[in-house]
């Protein structure tokens, strides 16, 4: 179910503070966050945000086409190792 339009998009306040602080400073560094639920705003474009996937922080460079999506969409939490291979040589006769 989509979020109500009257509520507007959501971004954690602590993440917005970090983005504003880095926009004001000359120094560009990776911004660490645990907020996978935050919506990407146009003010995030050009920043690298390290999003937590449950094990480590994965850096995501925010581009223009990512606006409106959630940060968690770009960092998978599960590692797919493939399906079990069929062993046809040792099959029953």
UniProtKB/Swiss-Prot annotation:
Pfam families hit by this protein: Ribosomal_S19
Keywords, alphabetical: Ribonucleoprotein, Ribosomal protein, RNA-binding, rRNA-binding
GO CC annotation: cytoplasm; small ribosomal subunit
Biological processes, Gene Ontology terms: ribosomal small subunit assembly; translation
Molecular functions per Gene Ontology: rRNA binding; structural constituent of ribosome
Keyword RNA-binding in record: yes
Presence of the UniProt keyword Transit peptide in the record: no
Family: Belongs to the universal ribosomal protein uS19 family.
Function: Protein S19 forms a complex with S13 that binds strongly to the 16S ribosomal RNA.
Protein name, entry field: Small ribosomal subunit protein uS19
């Amino acid at each position: 179910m989509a979020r109500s339009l009257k509520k507007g998009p959501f971004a954690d306040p602590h993440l917005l503070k970090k983005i504003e602080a880095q926009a004001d400073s000359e120094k560009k560094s990776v911004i660490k966050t645990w907020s996978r639920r935050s919506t990407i705003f146009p003010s995030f474009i050009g920043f690298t945000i390290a999003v937590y996937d449950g094990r480590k922080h994965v850096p995501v460079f925010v581009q223009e086409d990512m606006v409106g999506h959630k940060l968690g969409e770009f960092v998978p939490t599960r590692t797919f190792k493939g399906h079990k291979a069929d062993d046809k040589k040792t099959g029953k006769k």
